[in-house]
Amino acid sequence: MTKTLTKHLQAIKDSKRGIFVPYIMAGDHAKGLDGLFETITLLENSGVSAIEVGIPWSDPVADGPIIELAGQRSLAKDVTLTAIIKKLQEKKTQVPLVIMTYINPVYQYGIEAFVKDLAETSVKGLIIPDLPNEHADFITPYLRDSDIALVPLVSLTTGIDRQKQLIDGAEGFIYAVAINGVTGKTGNYRDDLDKHLSNLTAYADIPVLTGFGVSTEEDIKRFNAVSDGVIVGSKIVRDLHDGKEEEVAEFVTFGSHFEK
């Protein structure tokens, strides 16, 4: 069974539009979790393809300073994975949601219960950056009969054989990491990045999205030329925190309506 997230993003790719997925931190709002659907609605109204929802955690190894601070603000409001899932169960969204979490909160929640409870939300994808592919069977047996795709991350330093191993049989989309390091770093792209992304996109039979360090309209243009779209996190998180909703809506609209 092809997962909903795969079909949804593939349809956007087939329509010759760039896929645009913004990242937000659950609970990082003046209203805490009560503001989550306000932010989701703002992004939906700007035409996003899907929305990545971050789960705050005390040791976020892949997060840059902006997203790490957002997580700390959320944790200070006593936001938990349990509370986030309960909030997401309250209302269906117009576009698929993708949860980005570390493995420890999932383990503490209980893997089977986690997948079961997520199935009662609009979550259609799952990213766990500190879960190596070799240990994916930690959760894949529970996802197999669900409509939730486990999204693999492929970095620049990943060898060709390893890339193919990660891509073959993957669902949802391929998360292509544009820089080595944490989220939010910009401008330090390797010279062979475009070639790497082009090769990845040519090989994969599901959409390839470029993330980590994507923050400008020029980045959106560049990475749509060599992959199927982009994921933007730190810029969105920072601007939302600074109260720049109109600027966020304008930027997201540009990315979401980018014609190939």
From Swiss-Prot:
InterPro entries per the UniProt record, alphabetical: Aldolase_TIM, RibuloseP-bd_barrel, Trp_synthase_alpha_AS, Trp_synthase_suA
Documented EC number(s): 4.2.1.20
Pathway participation: Amino-acid biosynthesis; L-tryptophan biosynthesis; L-tryptophan from chorismate: step 5/5
One Gene Ontology term, aspect cellular component: cytosol
UniProt key word Amino-acid biosynthesis: yes
Reaction(s) this enzyme catalyzes, per UniProt: (1S,2R)-1-C-(indol-3-yl)glycerol 3-phosphate + L-serine = D-glyceraldehyde 3-phosphate + L-tryptophan + H2O
Pfam families linked: Trp_syntA
Gene Ontology molecular-function annotations: tryptophan synthase activity
Alphabetical list of PROSITE patterns matching this protein: TRP_SYNTHASE_ALPHA
Keywords (A to Z) from UniProt: Amino-acid biosynthesis, Aromatic amino acid biosynthesis, Lyase, Tryptophan biosynthesis
Coiled coil stretches, renumbered: none
Catalytic-site annotation from UniProt: E52 (proton acceptor), D63 (proton acceptor)
The keyword Chaperone appears for this protein: no
Self-association state and partner proteins as the record states: Tetramer of two alpha and two beta chains.
Role, per record: The alpha subunit is responsible for the aldol cleavage of indoleglycerol phosphate to indole and glyceraldehyde 3-phosphate.
Family: Belongs to the TrpA family.
Name of the featured protein: Tryptophan synthase alpha chain
Record organism: Streptococcus thermophilus (strain ATCC BAA-250 / LMG 18311)
Source species taxonomy: Bacteria, Bacillati, Bacillota, Bacilli, Lactobacillales
Gene name of the encoded protein: trpA
